[in-house]
Amino acid sequence: MGTRFLLALFLVLLVLGFEVQGAHLPQQEESASPALLTQMQESLSSYWDSAKAAASKLYQKTYLPTVDEKLRDMYSKSTAAMSTYAGILTDQVLSMLKGEE
């Protein structure tokens, strides 16, 4: 599973790298900064969409029901553990803030 994760991460970074190389914009005046912000938001959104599409394609290509079941089981166990530890941490912080009575 580790190699699949690394492969997916590599492909996402590769897609983002090619997108960044192709997005050379000429310099604009400072009065056009709202347009620059809009362009940056649009380019970040397109990068995110392309990364999601690449990850989805990779997931669909390498889909295995047993791996999917194991991932779902790991997710449910880890979220249960994290909620337990978050509750303990919250209690500790509240007791420190409240002080001894």
Swiss-Prot record:
User: Which residues lie in coiled coils?
Assistant: none
**Signal sequence interval, chain numbering:** 1-22
Name the segments for region: Lipid binding: 66-74
* The record's account of how the chain is modified after translation: Proapolipoprotein C-II is synthesized as a sialic acid containing glycoprotein which is subsequently desialylated prior to its proteolytic processing. Proapolipoprotein C-II, the major form found in plasma undergoes proteolytic cleavage of its N-terminal hexapeptide to generate apolipoprotein C-II, which occurs as the minor form in plasma.
Q: Which UniProt keywords are listed?
A: Chylomicron, Glycoprotein, HDL, LDL, Lipid degradation, Lipid metabolism, Lipid transport, Secreted, Sialic acid, Signal, Transport, VLDL
Provide the protein's localization.
Secreted
- Name any one Pfam family assigned in the record: Apo-CII
Q: Which InterPro entries does UniProt cross-reference here?
A: Apo-CII, ApoC-II_dom_sf
Chief place of localization: secreted
Output the Gene Ontology terms for molecular function.
phospholipase activator activity; phospholipase binding
Region described as Lipoprotein lipase cofactor: spans on this chain:
78-101
**One cellular component GO annotation, for this chain's record?**
very-low-density lipoprotein particle
Q: Which GO terms describe its biological process?
A: lipid catabolic process; lipid transport; positive regulation of phospholipid catabolic process
- What family does the Swiss-Prot or TrEMBL record give for this protein? Belongs to the apolipoprotein C2 family.
Reported function: Component of chylomicrons, very low-density lipoproteins (VLDL), low-density lipoproteins (LDL), and high-density lipoproteins (HDL) in plasma. Plays an important role in lipoprotein metabolism as an activator of lipoprotein lipase. Both proapolipoprotein C-II and apolipoprotein C-II can activate lipoprotein lipase.
By what name is this protein known?
Apolipoprotein C-II
Q: Which organism is it from?
A: Aotus nancymaae
